[in-house]
């Protein structure tokens, strides 16, 4: 038996849930110190929650949710992501790992290929929600063994009125044929049907 804890929203989504996504992105440019203060506060909150979860629930794995982009691009440059979010996630995921959590699964159903080095640095074991726009075979070739990729089936291809088992089987076979057997787990990206 394995205990898996899900946690949402993540740091970026918490920022734009407290405000609004467009204003949050503007604030990263116009109010960087205030945004860093907010993110530090959110990290402290996440660490307090992690302490309670690890003390009482003792999860084996964490499924953490924070969308970092659209289908075609991240919401911010890799440099900006590093400046604002990398250290916080290293603290959060580091805490979980040092307190018995064996597996960190991070959900971001988006394009985020440019952030994979940071995912590895912050301790993510599996990126769940990886969309086909990320060139998954290239990511596996470059980063396989350091991180695994779970996705490769864009939800819009299988989650719509009129879907069929044949359509799903075809997409699963396509994903497995394109991405191989190592460091890849076929899975729908999870987003809405239009994503």
Residue spans for each PLM region:
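Active-site loop segments of alpha/beta catalytic cores
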Residues: 1-195
């Amino acid at each position: 038996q394995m205990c898996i804890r899900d946690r949402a929203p993540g740091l970026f989504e918490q920022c734009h849930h407290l405000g609004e996504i467009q204003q949050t992105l503007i604030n990263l440019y116009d109010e960087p110190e205030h945004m860093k203060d907010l993110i530090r506060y959110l990290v402290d909150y996440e660490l307090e929650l992690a302490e309670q979860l690890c003390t009482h629930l003792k999860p084996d794995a964490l499924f953490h949710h924070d969308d970092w982009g659209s289908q075609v691009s991240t919401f911010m440059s890799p440099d900006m992501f590093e400046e604002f979010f990398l250290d916080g996630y290293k603290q959060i995921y580091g805490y979980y790992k040092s307190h018995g959590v064996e597996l960190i699964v991070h959900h971001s159903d988006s394009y985020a290929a440019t952030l994979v080095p940071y995912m590895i640095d912050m301790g993510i074991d599996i990126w769940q929600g990886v969309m086909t726009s990320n060139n998954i075979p290239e990511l596996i070739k470059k980063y396989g063994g350091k991180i695994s990729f779970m996705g490769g089936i864009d939800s819009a291809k299988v989650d719509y009125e009129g879907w069929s088992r044949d359509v799903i089987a075809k997409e699963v076979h396509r994903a497995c044929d394109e991405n191989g057997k190592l460091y890849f787990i076929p899975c729908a990206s999870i987003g809405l049907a239009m994503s």
